[in-house]
Amino acid sequence: MAKPVNVNQSKWTVPVLLKECEIYCPSTCVAFGPILSDNDSKLIIAHGGHRGVNMKLKVFQQLEQLSESSLADMPTALVHFINDLSSIPSIAVAAGPSLLIYKNLKPFYKFTVPSSAINPTESEAWKAVVNKKINGDTLLTVLKRLEDDVAFSKLTPISQTYLRADKETQVVLVEHYGTKIANSATITCIAKLTKSTAEPLDILVIGTEHCEIFLIDSQAFTILETIKIGSVPVNICAYGTYDVDYRLFVQTRASLIFCMKRGEADYQPIVISQSMITSMVLVNKMIVYTTVENLIHFASFRGKKMNTVKCPSKIKMLEPFIYPLKQLAAVIAVFDKEIRMYNEHYLLDTVQYEKPLAWVKYGCYGREDSTLVVAFKDGSIAIQIFRRKANFDTKLDYNQVPQAHALKLQIPKKTKVFIDLTQREVQLGNRIHKVYQKNLFDVKYRLAASYLELTSSASATVSTTTVLPVEISVDIHGFGPTFRMTIHLLSSSKQNLYDMHLSIISDPELYDFDTPLIPVHLLASGQSYSFTTLLYCKDPEKAANCDVRALLVHAKRATPIVTAVIKMPFSEFPLD
């Protein structure tokens, strides 16, 4: 539970545990909202059970469980929405490729996402194995070839399972599911968007594994719009109204954030993160997202960073905190055994717990507008209420200047040498500037000449075999700290070479590679192949360089086929 703190300083009440409660689910499977005629907000949880067993839709009121319903498939997300003004709201549970609609805690409707087209070669292979025209090994070979040609994610779910299964499971898949092949898209995330201010109905927004986003009418359950993006969506945040103007902020598995507006057809990412994005929420008119580097970024709707918070440990998730009575908007960051409340400038509050946390959910529960539901890893759930008399007079700047940096510099007094140099610069300023420009041009010229000499004569190749004659050459482009390395391979062997890799090795303290291991699936005789990767100098201020080796290796050979040694040039400083 929460550690004892001073009652006058704590902004939350003492947490109270729910009775006989054991819940295991992600934060996306939790929602608040009224679902009965009493209009009291309930806690709705899609319980994932244990290994696909005992999956339930549970509803809690006060400190007890009110009801539960069984779920046929593993839930991935849940949302509470309004689809009829004359009746009570509904619940939508995303499970597999389907959207399960519950009204009055009873199954009401099932919406299934449209399936995508199946690869013709894949479909023919499954039909052939069902009709006993080919065996399971041939099917596995065909699917592996398709995996290399069209990517693993483009195959149907049954083919993906077949590729990763053992022999016994593959036989069962062919016997029971071979005739039911379908390319259904699993729902990854779900959100809701208000239709209009005059008519407070909701539009459902869902994302799928096929990189598609569907806007669904919650009354007729028809697809209003279909949006195709270049990566798999994992989180959607909606802003605005559908009939007037709306924005959809989509976090993808490739650590991109897209902004989708009404009337736009070409969607480009507004945030491109070099490290993996783990969570994203909207607070007022800001995008708040976290990365695996323990950073919280505050950005505008255009993607421009406004501030960054460096956190002391791993951030599990973010939860928006809105308190209209005090016009307070912040974000709750969940750590292992504590939660912290941040806005774009300050650290507002910290609450510590004795047990590891799983997730938190903030919203209206029962008659309380500001309730925090805290879930622990052991399955227990606690309820805390935000104090109405809580104040935020004490604020901590999370980017405080270190004490050593805050010291004033001791500027020396004006000496005779200082005065003489100042007068010289005033009198001969134009001449000094011309000499400086001449010397700078001379340095740039010598640098370019040295760089050209290095790039033309710094590559040395060593071949360790005469059976597999392969020529290798390496080009280095750029001044640093980012270089582009292009490796050229030319095979003069009579036979084609298969299943090789290019391994790039250097001092890890000096350089970092974008792709240190490049697969080389085929080297045809007499054909030239080029492979490109990026090389980053970690610390250009050291003015150090070392040799970089490019090795062409094969899994069945103990020594490299051919090796290239590159003498790297010194890195320039970054422009920014």
Curated annotation (Swiss-Prot):
Pfam families (alphabetical): BBS1, GAE_BBS1
Physiological role: Component of the BBSome complex. The BBSome complex is thought to function as a coat complex required for sorting of specific membrane proteins to the primary cilia. The BBSome complex is required for ciliogenesis but is dispensable for centriolar satellite function. Required for proper BBSome complex assembly and its ciliary localization. Required for cilia biogenesis and both the assembly and movement of intraflagellar transport proteins along the ciliary axoneme.
MF GO annotations: patched binding; smoothened binding
Organs and tissues of expression: Expressed in ciliated cells including amphid and both inner and outer labial neurons of the head and in both phasmid neurons PHA and PHB in the tail at larval stages L1 and L2.
Keywords for this protein: Cell projection, Cilium, Cilium biogenesis/degradation, Cytoplasm, Cytoskeleton, Protein transport, Transport
Record's keyword annotation contains Amino-acid biosynthesis: no
Disruption-associated phenotype: Mutants have normal body morphology, but with reduced body length and width, delayed larval development and decreased roaming movements. Defective cilia structure and function.
Gene Ontology CC: axoneme; BBSome; centrosome; ciliary basal body; cilium; neuron projection
Lineage: Eukaryota, Metazoa, Ecdysozoa, Nematoda, Chromadorea
Location in or out of the cell: Cell projection, Cilium; Cytoplasm, Cytoskeleton, Cilium basal body; Cytoplasm, Cytoskeleton, Cilium axoneme
Coiled coil: none
Tree of life domain: Eukaryota
The protein's name in its UniProt record: BBSome complex member BBS1
Record organism: Caenorhabditis elegans
